[in-house]
């Protein structure tokens, strides 16, 4: 978890940047400065990652991805990563439904004594013409009701110099074009306290326009593709402990997403005219119940319903609608130094289309998970943990229904996860080293029925099929330390390292059978150091991504060099 001041020290501007400091994470950045930023946990694929904002999942039924670049850290209280699922069982059914989860918790107003309001303004600027002002206003309406308003604007030209070389000796320095971005984010919230509980309501709006610089092909350096996005949602949460044995958690949400993509041959003769508009709507409701059977033994039952629709102005578009029901039951036992949790999730999906085309058949799946942890020694803070989880992801609406590409006969994509690890921490009171924490995990993951795109008999027309199988073996390691040198100098550090061998075992007759899957490095890691002396503070952070390949063909032509970044702030 990254929270509070630790987030601010990392020189990160959005959630995607901050997530680079976790082990086992790959950030996919499509389109450079203004591109879509998604996250891949332990190489299982972006679609297997659930992203939750204030406890409710962010959805995208069209393509299954969430752009993390549109969530700022200026209004963020914590960013937490879970492999498998949260250790808490009191949660909506959807929280059990991902191979890995990221929880974004926005700031909750906190006031002391006679404080009535807080105001925070920031202005950031930097390379590539970045202008990034923001404001946060928190108001205490009365003792049991607070409000919050956050707004942010970001603009960048996206122009930066780069070197371009070809095999025939051509070598030049060029400036990246059509990488500009302007985006506005506004969100407001109400926070209420009730007896033995709370309620929250939030509204969020994000509006952006950006260019896509594209790849350099045959010495063509500029592109004119443009995209406009509008994302809006409003959501509410109610939680109350009715007694020491029963608690209720309810969530509700409505979301609207609009995307406009334009490729205009009047500006770029190499483009085929494309002027597409997509409209998504989502309605979601959830109720979770927790029962305390005995001290140390809890049981939860939760039920969710979600409705998604997708409209577009494409020829022969089928206008899909999806109804999803989820039921989860879970139990957790805590016996002194031993803890165990088991859950079973039922998922029921029904699709309809508004045309005479065939819709995908109904899907019904039951998927289990088991989590255990044990502290062998009472006086030593050493915890051994492990989990097994089987989960799946439904084909997205694009996978099933995209014009000329979708395939309604697709099966879900399954994952099996096995994890074994430990955490050790110790505090010291009479030495320079004040605390140390070590975490290590060894894991093995399988991805079955992997959904991929493949060309048909007409190479210019592709379709979606179930074909791939991937096996992932990896190690995540993390070290955190705190030092007190003298009375006034403090030093904190964290190091993360990941080793992953993610192999493609789709076709045993393939020349590159068993090769590392695209863009997954064998080695990656990060480091961050924070130094404090009196009222001064210095922060240094480092991110490393090792060598990798751009295709499952692990040959020299597809080789990608390692890269690293360093950030220093005072």
Label the model's feature ranges.
Residues 16-57:
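Extracytoplasmic beta-strand/coil segments of soluble accessory domains associated
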Residues 73-120:
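A beta-strand signature from Gram-negative outer-membrane beta-barrel systems
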Residues 435-446, 463-552:
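Gram-negative outer-membrane beta-barrel transporters
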Residues 245, 249-263, 377, 383-389, ...:
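Membrane-embedded beta-barrel scaffold of Gram-negative outer-membrane proteins
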Residues 109-117, 143-144, 196-198, 241-247, ...:
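Short loop/turn motifs that connect adjacent beta-strands in outer-membrane beta-barrel proteins
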Residues 160, 173, 177-183, 196-248, ...:
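Flexible loop and strand-edge segments within Gram-negative outer membrane beta-barrel domains
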Residues 294-445, 528-530:
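Structural signature of Gram-negative outer-membrane beta-barrels, strongest in the C-terminal barrel
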Residues 123-127, 153-157, 194-196, 205-209, ...:
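Transmembrane beta-strands of outer-membrane beta-barrel pores
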């Amino acid at each position: 978890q990254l929270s509070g001041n630790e987030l601010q020290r990392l020189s990160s501007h959005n959630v995607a940047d901050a997530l680079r400091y976790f082990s086992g994470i790959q950030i996919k950045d499509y389109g450079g400065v203004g591109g879509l930023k998604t996250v891949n946990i332990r190489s299982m694929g972006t679609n297997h990652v659930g992203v939750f904002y204030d406890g409710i999942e962010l959805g995208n039924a069209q393509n299954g991805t969430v752009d993390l670049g549109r969530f700022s850290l200026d209004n963020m209280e914590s960013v937490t990563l879970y492999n498998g699922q949260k250790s808490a069982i009191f949660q909506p059914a959807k929280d059990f439904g991902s191979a890995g989860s990221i929880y974004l918790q926005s700031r909750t107003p906190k006031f002391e004594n006679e404080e009535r309001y807080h105001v925070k303004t920031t202005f950031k600027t930097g390379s590539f013409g970045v202008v990034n002002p923001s404001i946060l206003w928190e108001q205490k309406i009365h003792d049991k009701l607070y409000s919050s308003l956050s707004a942010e604007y970001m603009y960048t030209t996206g122009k930066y110099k780069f070197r371009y070389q070809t095999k025939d000796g051509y070598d030049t320095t060029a400036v990246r074009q059509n990488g500009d971005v302007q985006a506005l984010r506004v969100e407001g919230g109400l926070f209420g306290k009730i007896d033995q509980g709370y309620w929250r309501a939030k509204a969020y709006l994000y509006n952006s326009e950006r260019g896509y610089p594209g790849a350099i092909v045959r010495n063509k350096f500029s592109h004119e593709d443009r995209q406009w996005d509008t994302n809006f949602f409003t959501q509410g949460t109610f939680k109350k402990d009715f007694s020491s044995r029963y608690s209720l958690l309810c969530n509700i949400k409505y979301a609207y997403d609009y995307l406009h993509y334009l490729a205009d041959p009047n500006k770029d003769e190499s483009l085929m005219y494309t002027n597409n508009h997509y409209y998504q709507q989502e309605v979601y409701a959830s109720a979770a119940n927790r029962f305390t059977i005995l001290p140390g033994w809890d049981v939860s039952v939760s039920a969710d319903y979600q409705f998604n629709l997708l409209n577009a102005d494409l020829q022969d578009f089928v206008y899909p609608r999806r109804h999803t029901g989820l039921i989860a039951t879970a139990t957790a036992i805590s016996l002194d130094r031993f803890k165990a949790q088991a859950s079973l999730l039922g998922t029921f999906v029904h699709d309809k289309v508004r045309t005479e085309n065939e819709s995908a058949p109904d899907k019904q799946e039951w998927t289990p998970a088991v989590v255990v942890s044990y502290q062998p020694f009472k006086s030593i803070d050493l915890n051994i943990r492990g989990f097994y989880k089987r989960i799946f992801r439904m084909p997205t609406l694009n996978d099933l229904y995209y014009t000329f590409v979708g395939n309604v006969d697709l099966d879900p994509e399954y994952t099996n996860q096995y994890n074994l690890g430990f955490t050790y921490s110790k505090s010291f009171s009479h030495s320079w080293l004040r605390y140390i924490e070590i975490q290590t995990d060894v894991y093995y993951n399988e991805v079955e029925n992997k959904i991929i795109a493949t060309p048909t008999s007409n190479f210019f027309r592709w379709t979606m099929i179930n074909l791939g199988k991937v096996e992932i073996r990896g190690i995540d390691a993390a070290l955190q330390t705190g030092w007190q040198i003298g009375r006034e100098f403090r030093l904190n550090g964290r190091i993360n390292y990941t080793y992953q061998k993610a192999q493609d075992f789709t076709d045993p007759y393939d020349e590159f059978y068993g090769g590392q899957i695209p863009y997954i490095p064998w080695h990656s890691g990060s480091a961050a150091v924070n130094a404090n002396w009196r009222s001064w503070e210095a922060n240094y952070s480092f991110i490393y991504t090792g060598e990798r390949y751009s295709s499952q063909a692990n040959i020299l032509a597809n080789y990608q060099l390692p890269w690293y970044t360093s950030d220093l702030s005072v």
